[in-house]
Structures are given as structure tokens and as C-alpha cells.
């Protein structure tokens, strides 16, 4: 067996391990969320299936797998099927350039940051396709909300990272992590971090920015007509998006795998888990604002913060160069 074939098989195996880990983390987060919400709300939560309810996730997956794969007769069948597939795969593909350790990662692209923004932006097509193809007024309204919110906050998501690019001079995520060996980016880029955090919550449609899926207003929004595994793909895709945003926060602002004593991957996993729990805490503690308030907050607060952050970072870098 040639060396090139061995290298190819190793890369494929590495990609499969990352894929299984990401999907597993996203699925397991749904169980952790239910347990934590129950703890904070002084109730039991899932505790019937397996010890401490640990098999509840497997029971939910089996239930979704055997539910009827129903497609409304008035729906656009092809687009209706395509939407959850895009929603599930977009965030997974974005993980290809996230470095987990100094030597472990699927791909090492010099334009890794641009790749993530481009691939993650494909998720908005899944929302539009789901709302349009369902031929349901609530689904369409939810998809229009989601597309407007996602497209707006993706602007702030990208601009909030430009300070890091100016500071490090690279779009490569591995270079950005290595540049944080002495000082994490969250200190000089605190404005960028705050904006990225808000934008990440909005792009993943998580509470309190879950207006596209507001049950009280839109009856679950753009996936109201979905059931079974198609709904499951949307469901798991949302949690994978949370894992992606959490890992990006760690990679870009909190030093990635850097940390004392423990192995690099353990540090990366612990930091990512902390922000995943933070996402759950937001759901448990904050009310849902109106949709116009969400959009106004983005354009009137997040956009000025990103521009000020870029100006300050550019001025500091220019002064240091001179």
C-alpha cells in the first residue's frame, strides 16, 4: 500500500471521527439541556429511561426514526426534502477547518475563517426552502423572519472577527490560536467577542433570539409541517450549530487548545462545554424580545460596536508598526 493511499485513509478516518463526535455532541447536548433546565426549574426532567435518564436520547432517536415520514400533499416535495438536509450538513461542513489540537483537524485552510462564514451561511437557504416548500402561512412567516435575522446578524458575525484578522494578519484558524499563546484574544478584542456572542445566538436561532420558531406566535415556525427524521435533522442541526459557535468562540477568543497541565484536546473540550452550558443558561433565564427589537438591536448596537472595534484595532496595529 502506497504512502499516498495511507495518508488518504488516515484523513478519511480523521474526518469520520470528527463527524461522529460532532453529531454525538449535538445530540447529547439536547439531553443535557433538558436535565439542566429541569434542575434550574426545580423539577425532575427525563429520568425514566436508563440510569439517571441517560438512555432518553436513544429513546428519542428511535421514536423519531419510526415516526411516519409524512409530506403534506400541498408541499413542494423536492425542496421540502432538501431543506433539512442542508440544515444538517451546513454546520457539519463548517467544522472541517476548526483545529481541535495543534495536530488534529480535518483541514488546514489559509482562508479557514472565510470558509466557515460562507458554509454556515448556507443554512439560511434551508430555512427559506422549508418555509416556501411547506405552503403554510406560519411556516412562511417563520422562514422570512429567520432569513432576515440570519442575514443581518451574519454581517455582524463577520465584522466582529475582522479585528482578530487585523491583529493576527491571517484567516487561518490555526495561526489565530497560535497567536494566543501569551494572551487570549478576548482581552484586546472584548468588543468583538461581545458582538460575536450576540450574533452567534441570533444566527443559530437560539433563545432569546428564537423569533423564527416562536411557538406562541408562529406555531413552531418554518418546520411546522415537518415530522420524523426530517424534523430530527432540523433539531440536531440546531444543536450542532451551537457546538460550532461555542467551538469558534473558544478558538478565536479563548486560546483554543492552550492551557496548563491538561492535554490540548481536554482544554478545548472543557472550554467548548462551558459555552454550550452558557447557551442553555440563556434559554433558562431570559425572556424573548419582539422581532423588531431583535433587528433594531443588531443594526443600532452590534453594527456600531463592530465598526468601533475595527477602528481601534486598526489604529493600535498601525501605531505598533510605526
UniProtKB/Swiss-Prot annotation:
Gene Ontology biological process terms from the UniProt entry: aerobic respiration
Keyword Protein biosynthesis: no
InterPro entries in the cross-refs: NADH_UbQ_OxRdtase_su1/FPO, NADH_UbQ_OxRdtase_su1_CS
Signal peptide: none
A Pfam family it matches: NADHdh
Entry's Gene Ontology cellular component terms: plasma membrane
Function: NDH-1 shuttles electrons from NADH, via FMN and iron-sulfur (Fe-S) centers, to quinones in the respiratory chain. The immediate electron acceptor for the enzyme in this species is believed to be ubiquinone. Couples the redox reaction to proton translocation (for every two electrons transferred, four hydrogen ions are translocated across the cytoplasmic membrane), and thus conserves the redox energy in a proton gradient. This subunit may bind ubiquinone.
Subunit structure: NDH-1 is composed of 14 different subunits. Subunits NuoA, H, J, K, L, M, N constitute the membrane sector of the complex.
NCBIfam families, sorted: PRK06076.1-1 (NF004740), PRK06076.1-2 (NF004741)
Protein name: NADH-quinone oxidoreductase subunit H
Organism: Aeromonas salmonicida (strain A449)
Amino acid at each position: 500500500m502506497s504512502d499516498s493511499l495511507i495518508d488518504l485513509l488516515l484523513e478519511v478516518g480523521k474526518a469520520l471521527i470528527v463527524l461522529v463526535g460532532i453529531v454525538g455532541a449535538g445530540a447529547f447536548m439536547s439531553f443535557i439541556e433538558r436535565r439542566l433546565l429541569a434542575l434550574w426549574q426545580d423539577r425532575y426532567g427525563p429520568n425514566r429511561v436508563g440510569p439517571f435518564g441517560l438512555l432518553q436520547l436513544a429513546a428519542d432517536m428511535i421514536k423519531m426514526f419510526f415516526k411516519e415520514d409524512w409530506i403534506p400533499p400541498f408541499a413542494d416535495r423536492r425542496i421540502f426534502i432538501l431543506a433539512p438536509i442542508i440544515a444538517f450538513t451546513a454546520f457539519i461542513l463548517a467544522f472541517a477547518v476548526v483545529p481541535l489540537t495543534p495536530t488534529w483537524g480535518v483541514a488546514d485552510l489559509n482562508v479557514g475563517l472565510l470558509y466557515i462564514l460562507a458554509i454556515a451561511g448556507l443554512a439560511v437557504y434551508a430555512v427559506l426552502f422549508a418555509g416556501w416548500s411547506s405552503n403554510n402561512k406560519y411556516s412562511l412567516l417563520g422562514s422570512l423572519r429567520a432569513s432576515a435575522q440570519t442575514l443581518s446578524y451574519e454581517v455582524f458575525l463577520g465584522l466582529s472577527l475582522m479585528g482578530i484578522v487585523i491583529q493576527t494578519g491571517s484567516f487561518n484558524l490555526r495561526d489565530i490560536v497560535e497567536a494566543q499563546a501569551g494572551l487570549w484574544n478576548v482581552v484586546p478584542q472584548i468588543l468583538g467577542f461581545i458582538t460575536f456572542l450576540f450574533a452567534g445566538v441570533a444566527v443559530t436561532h437560539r433563545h432569546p433570539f428564537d423569533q423564527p420558531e416562536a411557538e406562541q406566535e408562529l406555531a413552531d415556525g418554518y418546520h411546522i409541517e415537518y415530522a420524523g427524521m426530517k424534523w430530527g435533522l432540523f433539531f440536531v442541526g440546531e444543536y450542532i450549530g451551537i457546538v460550532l459557535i461555542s467551538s469558534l468562540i473558544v478558538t478565536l477568543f479563548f486560546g483554543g487548545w492552550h492551557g496548563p497541565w491538561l492535554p490540548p484536546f481536554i482544554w478545548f473540550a472543557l472550554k467548548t462545554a462551558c459555552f454550550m452550558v452558557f447557551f442553555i443558561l440563556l434559554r433558562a433565564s431570559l425572556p424573548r424580545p419582539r422581532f423588531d427589537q431583535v433587528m433594531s438591536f443588531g443594526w443600532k448596537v452590534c453594527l456600531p460596536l463592530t465598526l468601533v472595534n475595527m477602528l481601534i484595532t486598526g489604529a493600535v496595529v498601525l501605531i505598533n508598526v510605526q
